[in-house]
């Protein structure tokens, strides 16, 4: 390498990869790797930007997905690129593989896409609609004949287990007990305990609104799994790239619409920007005419999932992984805001093109 590497470690989950770079450069035909920059925004995998004589590339160490699924997802990505979806086409090694293994560590490589991430409140209404159109196009392309050999047609019925209020309270009490047993609680521990107490109050007040069936409304099909501002690149007002394709799964389309909107236009700000949400939903419906009741079902299920789940605390206390700590308190504020305005939120998701 001709330039010193930036710090490429990030806690215990990422190894220093300098020893792997020579092999990766040879495998992918990159020549000498001139610089390697760690990208801290990825929450689940290791990501780096490589500068080489062949150009700039995004290198991902595959850590959060089984290798067979990663290979399938990379093959799907190539098909989507052929269909005109704004994605990077995976690079192949000298042996024709999209995954390179080095000392038991698996990597994939994609040409670097120039662009920036834009939180939802930075988007104009037209851009919010464009994002909805793109999500609709992704759903159409993931479920057409081009990808059928990789992603077999999905069933119209999909089980959607609903956490009981009792189970949600039990989980809250478990985390409260863990915090109470700490010898030296941190500021995060103190704030988490307060938030858990407030969550239990919400559970007591709104438990009777939990979804009554364990089957989600259709249509269902193959979905991206994490379309939101961290995984969408913009340049000159246009979407130029969709990233992070390692969560392709069969889900209700409405589930991904609801999740994308609440992460893109809310969540970290403590409220949902309803006008942009409506524009996004109308854009999506211009491509995929999902019925209003189906999307309403998805929105209610997502609300209850947030009400009854504590995934950031699972990471923090059960896995000793603090990488998502910063998401917990904003999510709690958003949940309280959403719970008090459930009808307004549903109206936003009923928008038509």
Where are these regions (language model features)?
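A cross-family kinase active-site recognition segment
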Residues: 125-195
């Amino acid at each position: 390498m001709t330039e010193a590497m930036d710090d490429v470690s990030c806690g215990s989950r990422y190894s220093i990869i300098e020893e792997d770079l020579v092999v990766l450069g040879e495998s992918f035909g990159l020549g000498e790797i001139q610089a390697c920059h760690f990208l801290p925004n990825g929450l689940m995998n290791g990501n780096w930007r490589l500068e080489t004589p062949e150009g700039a590339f995004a290198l991902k160490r595959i850590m959060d997905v089984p290798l067979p699924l990663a290979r399938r997802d990379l093959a799907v990505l190539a098909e989507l690129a052929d269909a005109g979806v704004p994605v990077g086409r995976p690079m192949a090694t000298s042996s024709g593989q999209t995954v390179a293994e080095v000392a038991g560590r698996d990597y994939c490589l994609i040409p670097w896409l120039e662009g920036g991430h834009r939180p939802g409140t930075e988007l104009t209404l037209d851009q919010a609609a464009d994002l909805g159109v793109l999500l609709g196009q992704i759903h159409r392309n993931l479920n057409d004949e081009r990808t059928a050999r990789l992603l077999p047609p999905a069933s119209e019925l999909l089980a959607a287990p609903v956490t009981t209020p009792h189970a949600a309270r039990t989980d809250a009490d478990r985390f409260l007990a863990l915090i109470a047993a700490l010898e030296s609680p941190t500021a995060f521990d103190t704030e988490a305990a307060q938030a858990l107490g407030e969550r239990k109050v919400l559970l007591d007040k709104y438990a009777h609104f939990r979804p009554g069936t364990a089957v989600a409304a259709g249509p269902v099909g193959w979905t991206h799994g994490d379309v939101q501002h961290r995984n969408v690149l913009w340049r000159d007002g246009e979407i130029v790239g969709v990233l992070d394709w390692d969560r392709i799964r069969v889900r209700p389309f409405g589930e991904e619409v609801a999740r994308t909107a609440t992460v893109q236009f809310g969540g970290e700000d403590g409220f949902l920007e309803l006008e942009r949400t409506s524009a996004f939903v109308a854009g999506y419906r211009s491509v995929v005419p999902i019925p209003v009741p189906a999307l309403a079902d998805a929105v209610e299920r997502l609300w209850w999932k947030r009400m009854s789940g504590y995934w950031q605390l699972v990471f923090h206390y059960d896995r000793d992984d603090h990488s998502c700590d910063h998401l917990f308190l904003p999510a709690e504020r958003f949940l309280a805001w959403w719970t008090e305005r459930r009808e307004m939120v549903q109206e936003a998701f009923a928008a038509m093109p």
